[in-house]
């Protein structure tokens, strides 16, 4: 992969410290993912916050002395590990890339039973119920024919109270999608399985979920149906596909045996409970689906909704009189009664769980992580870029020798810019650069998504581009994030001083945790990852109803992991920590320029 060889000015981090006789101005310059300086300003705190920035100091403080210093920012590629994947979009398909290997996706989902949903009653000489509404429209025994199976209130054929309560024709599943990744005409196939274990709403479902824990791998017991498809269905006329109202789908018909058994249980239980038939009761009968890609490489569908229709046979009736309508044309051997198929829908919604299972090529991902002359972002659940900020050095320069000064210096306006390599590719279906990325303290990278939080500029900061031609991820002010780190360090130092030690919880990539006890701040810094941040590709949802038509802005209402295939190659990498004989950083393939700024003195 090409690397640039020109001299690049990545930015700088400016800090100004005020004291009675002079002010020290420190300029901190990072490697590639450099803290670009808008301004970091320190000043003596006198309960007057009007003096933010050099230009806002009183006249007597305008003349200052300054000196220059530099500090490195370290970046490296790290495994994304398992990520939180409970979203309202299901991903299914397979795609192989020459750099990142094969990525495969499938999803597990519950289906929602609408509150108060009921099935029609059986026609009993009239379709009208006690309230004179035509709700008894399911065919009676005479209308069952060969295309519907009767459902009775008891399986005991000798029971004198046995009666027909409904029928089942089939069950169909529609997987609706508005977009996809990859080749529109790659031949693919998916299979749908019935879950035999409930998805627990109390657990956070991650991309490493094991589907086999929730369904019977014996296909005779769990397979509901299969379907071959292409992302663009050429059997649909162009004129139809071009309609704004057209939404493509993969249509899966349940196997006859599965449809009859599941449909019978659903309708029977719904008949018993009436309007009290709810999600809890529905889940006892049908726990959900697992949608798995089992053939084809080159396409990933983004499923907006899975919709299961329980289909039954009905009479066409006069809604006023309740009388069956007759066919206008009756073929020999056919019933004269006019019939049609009705259905009740159970679909994926925000009220139920949908969990994506994503599988990346571990060897290919590891090879990319081992690359040390740049870093990667790779979605979904592939690679994050970890950033280590020089906060310990910032703290040392911020804190003076006296306790009074330790409490009086503050930080203001730090800008971080992370340059992106401009990629050129002749791949027909190349992955795009992630547009929205979240910079977050490493300690919060899991809980942020579990709790469905929004960026607060204290523990996290969101980058949203204002143009499609952006060349770096820019975070205009991470000051509060640095202050949050410093607050953690101060708290740890205080606890060590008062108690003699502090216990740190360390979690590995697999989610395994262990406790470590340290008795000095240096060991705490080394183990706590207090100064580490992670750059994560995200999917941002905005509230269109709150859009400001004049400024074109809208409120962010949700930030989730981006589960669409995408990647970016970022300038940086672990080689930036290597120094030459003079102690200067060495940057492979990119020349590094120390920034020099003039020093001003008070007269």
Give the location of each predicted region.
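Positively charged n-region of N-terminal signal peptides that target proteins for export
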Residues: 28-31
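Sec-dependent N-terminal signal peptides
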Residues: 33-40
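A short beta-strand-loop element at or near the start of a globular domain
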Residues: 49-180, 247, 268-277, 354-422
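C-terminal globular interaction/adhesion domains in large, modular proteins
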Residues: 153, 193, 198-386
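Conserved small/polar residues in nucleotide/adenosyl-binding loops
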Residues: 593-599
